[in-house]
UniProtKB/Swiss-Prot annotation:
Entry annotated with the keyword Disulfide bond: yes
Keyword Transit peptide part of the UniProt annotation: no
Keyword tags: Cytolysis, Disulfide bond, Hemolysis, Knottin, Plant defense, Signal
Disulfide bonds: C85-C101, C89-C103, C94-C108
Post-translational note: Cycloviolacin-O13 is a cyclic peptide.
Coiled coil, from the record: none
Signal sequence annotation: 1-22
Residue stretch(es) of the prosequence: 23-81, 112-115
Entry protein name: Cycloviolacin-O13
Any one GO BP annotation for this protein: defense response
Cyclopeptide (Gly-Asn) cross-link, chain position(s): G82-N111
Length: 115
Protein backbone atom coordinates (compact mmCIF):
# COMPACT_ATOMS: atom_id res chain seq x y z
CA UNK A 1 0.00 0.00 0.00
CA UNK A 2 2.80 2.44 0.83
CA UNK A 3 4.53 1.67 -2.45
CA UNK A 4 1.39 2.64 -4.35
CA UNK A 5 1.17 5.97 -2.50
CA UNK A 6 4.83 6.68 -3.16
CA UNK A 7 4.40 5.85 -6.84
CA UNK A 8 1.36 8.15 -7.13
CA UNK A 9 3.27 10.93 -5.36
CA UNK A 10 6.24 10.47 -7.69
CA UNK A 11 3.99 10.59 -10.75
CA UNK A 12 2.29 13.76 -9.48
CA UNK A 13 5.63 15.45 -8.84
CA UNK A 14 6.93 14.44 -12.26
CA UNK A 15 3.75 15.65 -13.92
CA UNK A 16 3.29 19.04 -12.27
CA UNK A 17 6.37 20.17 -10.35
CA UNK A 18 9.20 19.37 -12.74
CA UNK A 19 7.87 21.27 -15.80
CA UNK A 20 7.24 24.39 -13.72
CA UNK A 21 10.73 24.21 -12.22
CA UNK A 22 12.21 23.91 -15.70
CA UNK A 23 10.67 27.24 -16.72
CA UNK A 24 12.50 29.04 -13.92
CA UNK A 25 15.81 27.99 -15.46
CA UNK A 26 15.14 29.91 -18.68
CA UNK A 27 15.35 33.61 -19.34
CA UNK A 28 12.25 35.38 -20.59
CA UNK A 29 11.35 37.78 -23.37
CA UNK A 30 8.12 39.57 -24.36
CA UNK A 31 6.40 39.30 -27.75
CA UNK A 32 6.79 43.08 -28.15
CA UNK A 33 10.57 42.79 -27.75
CA UNK A 34 10.69 40.02 -30.35
CA UNK A 35 8.79 42.24 -32.81
CA UNK A 36 11.11 45.20 -32.10
CA UNK A 37 14.19 43.04 -32.71
CA UNK A 38 12.75 41.71 -35.97
CA UNK A 39 11.88 45.21 -37.21
CA UNK A 40 15.32 46.57 -36.32
CA UNK A 41 17.45 43.67 -37.59
CA UNK A 42 15.66 42.74 -40.81
CA UNK A 43 12.77 45.04 -41.71
CA UNK A 44 12.58 43.88 -45.35
CA UNK A 45 13.29 40.20 -44.78
CA UNK A 46 11.00 37.38 -45.76
CA UNK A 47 8.73 35.45 -43.41
CA UNK A 48 11.05 32.42 -43.27
CA UNK A 49 13.82 34.47 -41.65
CA UNK A 50 11.37 35.77 -39.06
CA UNK A 51 10.19 32.24 -38.28
CA UNK A 52 13.81 31.09 -37.86
CA UNK A 53 14.56 33.95 -35.48
CA UNK A 54 11.41 33.33 -33.46
CA UNK A 55 12.17 29.60 -33.23
CA UNK A 56 15.69 30.35 -31.99
CA UNK A 57 14.31 32.75 -29.39
CA UNK A 58 11.71 30.24 -28.22
CA UNK A 59 14.37 27.59 -27.73
CA UNK A 60 16.57 29.93 -25.69
CA UNK A 61 14.08 32.15 -23.83
CA UNK A 62 10.54 31.80 -22.50
CA UNK A 63 7.97 34.14 -24.06
CA UNK A 64 5.91 35.74 -21.31
CA UNK A 65 3.09 38.29 -21.39
CA UNK A 66 3.95 41.95 -21.03
CA UNK A 67 1.68 42.84 -18.03
CA UNK A 68 3.34 40.19 -15.84
CA UNK A 69 6.80 41.56 -16.62
CA UNK A 70 5.76 45.19 -16.16
CA UNK A 71 4.32 44.41 -12.74
CA UNK A 72 7.51 42.61 -11.69
CA UNK A 73 9.69 45.46 -12.96
CA UNK A 74 7.66 48.09 -11.13
CA UNK A 75 7.92 46.19 -7.86
CA UNK A 76 11.63 45.38 -8.10
CA UNK A 77 13.15 48.29 -10.02
CA UNK A 78 14.34 51.51 -8.47
CA UNK A 79 14.15 53.30 -11.82
CA UNK A 80 17.86 54.08 -12.02
CA UNK A 81 18.79 51.42 -14.57
CA UNK A 82 16.72 52.78 -17.45
CA UNK A 83 13.68 51.56 -19.36
CA UNK A 84 13.09 47.78 -19.15
CA UNK A 85 13.35 46.11 -22.55
CA UNK A 86 11.11 43.16 -21.67
CA UNK A 87 13.87 40.58 -21.42
CA UNK A 88 15.96 38.95 -18.71
CA UNK A 89 19.66 38.15 -18.96
CA UNK A 90 20.27 35.70 -16.12
CA UNK A 91 21.74 32.94 -18.30
CA UNK A 92 21.66 34.26 -21.87
CA UNK A 93 22.87 37.77 -22.87
CA UNK A 94 20.40 40.37 -24.09
CA UNK A 95 19.15 39.51 -27.56
CA UNK A 96 17.57 42.96 -27.51
CA UNK A 97 21.05 44.52 -27.72
CA UNK A 98 20.14 45.03 -31.39
CA UNK A 99 17.67 47.70 -30.26
CA UNK A 100 20.05 49.33 -27.74
CA UNK A 101 19.47 47.29 -24.58
CA UNK A 102 22.15 46.12 -22.17
CA UNK A 103 22.20 43.80 -19.14
CA UNK A 104 22.04 45.39 -15.68
CA UNK A 105 21.10 43.40 -12.57
CA UNK A 106 19.93 40.37 -14.63
CA UNK A 107 17.43 42.47 -16.63
CA UNK A 108 17.89 44.10 -20.05
CA UNK A 109 17.46 47.89 -19.91
CA UNK A 110 17.65 50.69 -22.45
CA UNK A 111 19.10 53.99 -21.32
CA UNK A 112 17.17 56.70 -23.16
CA UNK A 113 20.08 59.13 -22.70
CA UNK A 114 22.41 56.91 -24.74
CA UNK A 115 20.23 57.08 -27.87
Amino acid sequence: MDAKKMFVALVLIATFALPSLATFEKDFITPETIQAILKKSAPLSNIMLEEDVINALLKSKTVISNPIIEEAFLKNSNGLNGIPCGESCVWIPCISAAIGCSCKSKVCYRNSLDN
